[in-house]
Amino acid sequence: MLFRSSSSKDATADADGLAQADITVVAVTVGDDGIIYDCVIDSIQSKLNFDTSGALLSDLTLTIPSKNELGADYGMGKISSIGREWNEQAQSLADYVVGKTIPEVKGISISEEGKPTGADLTASVTMSIGGYISAIEQAAANASHLGASKGDRLVLTTTTNAAKSTDATSDADGLAQAYAT
């Protein structure tokens, strides 16, 4: 798993605050030859709203769905120049790295914004992939042989919630925290 924080905003008199954490999750199966046999990419975007007093406004009992779980409800397809949802683009990237080694994955041409620049990938992926390339590299580095074989189905599941988040009080800061397992 990789974590990167993004888009958090302070609460003001005119607008609620936002504590946002983006969690990237990647699983790979890698052969003894270093070739990626399978890859699954997912991301969880947890968003918790709070007011100027530090009281959390979001329902902390809800499970936070991943972008793959959201599918079309994530809404990227409506704004994507190629009309593809996040989960479709992530699957295209995962499919693209199958059969490649990590040096080949790290060699994927990307722009300064982390978006793919090669015609073979831009037809199906226009979102920023720099962080996903790093996550694939990290997943491969952490992979250990547990008996999987080429052709086995790789599945990635997560459960994410913010149940341990707390409101701010006069004595202590609040905590907006997502837990993914």
Language model region names:
Residues 4-181:
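Active-site- and interface-proximal helix/loop "cap" or "latch" segments in soluble metabolic
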